Regions:
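Surface-exposed binding/hinge segments that line
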Residues: 34, 70-133
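Gly/Pro-rich hinge or "lid" segments in bacterial periplasmic/extracellular proteins
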Residues: 118-179, 183, 193
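Ligand-site clamp/hinge motif
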Residues: 171-216
Length: 262
């Protein structure tokens, strides 16, 4: 239901085949992002412009933003740190060229800017939706909590039953054309039941639990497909808090890891 503004190839190198093209100026420390069409639309029919992309950078860098996306990727943009700290009214490094292009000025050019998930943000939000909601209230918004959604993906949200299922239908405004499927229904299934459900042919696609591999590796009615993850998993222990003023993690001396298993 959502789509990145950029596409990438089998080596995770960003390409110019998606919603936008990229022009790197290594010496000038800039990246120019240009929408590949003036006719793109959000799933609610509203036009897509470069203002949506600029708005996304500005909003994630806003001092009231409480999400997890703001990091060194965004702070590498000229003027972002000052904007984030409330010392500037705008981000000086976001230079709008026209309604479909923006030149981003960076403090430093990083190799990962050419990679998916790297130092160039591929995230884009509908300004006409989120500009009407105070940034500090985003986490409570129905557009963030999932009951409503406006995106750029091949499908759009038709209905949701919390804790049970989500039903999607084709997005008639999808930039690559209408999806061939008329409907997609995603259901939450217990890991204890998914093997028997797939064996019975109830679902077309499922993410199978690794721990039960031996119980489904020989099923004749399914094709097993695997891939390398581009991320890592970790366990974090809450032993204090982050002090925003000092920019340091402060350990709580009363916090204890009393579980002997750990």
């Amino acid at each position: 239901i959502d789509a990145s503004i950029f596409e990438y190839d089998e080596n995770r190198q960003l390409t110019n085949t998606g919603l936008a093209s990229i022009d790197y100026d290594i010496e000038g420390k800039t990246v120019t992002v240009t929408l590949n069409s003036k006719d793109y639309k959000w799933s609610d029919g509203q036009p897509v412009t470069i203002d949506d992309y600029i708005f996304t950078y500005q909003s994630i860098g806003h001092k009231d933003y409480t999400g997890s996306r703001y990091n060194s990727k965004y702070e590498n943009v000229e003027g972002m740190k000052e904007f984030h700290e409330g010392k500037a009214d705008s981000v000086s490094g976001l230079e709008k060229i026209d309604d479909y292009s923006v030149k981003i000025h960076f403090k430093e050019m990083r190799p990962s800017m050419k990679l998916a998930g790297g130092a160039l943000s591929a995230y884009i939000m509908p300004k006409h939706i989120f500009s009407t909601i105070p940034v500090a209230e985003w986490d409570k918004s129905e557009y963030v909590r999932g009951t409503k959604f406006v995106g750029l993906g091949a499908f759009k949200l038709e209905s949701i039953i919390p804790g049970e299922s989500v039903t999607l239908v084709p997005n008639e405004h999808y930039y690559k054309g209408r999806a061939k499927l008329d409907k997609v229904v995603m259901e939450i299934v217990s890991p204890d039941n998914i093997v028997s459900e797939m064996k019975a042919g109830k679902y077309d696609i499922a993410e199978m639990p690794n721990a039960q591999y031996e119980s489904y590796k020989d099923l004749t009615n399914v094709n097993l497909v695997s891939t390398f993850k581009s991320s890592f998993e970790y366990i974090a222990f809450h032993l204090g808090k982050f002090d925003k003023a000092s920019g340091k993690n402060i350990t709580d001396p009363k916090a204890k890891m009393s579980d002997p298993v750990l």
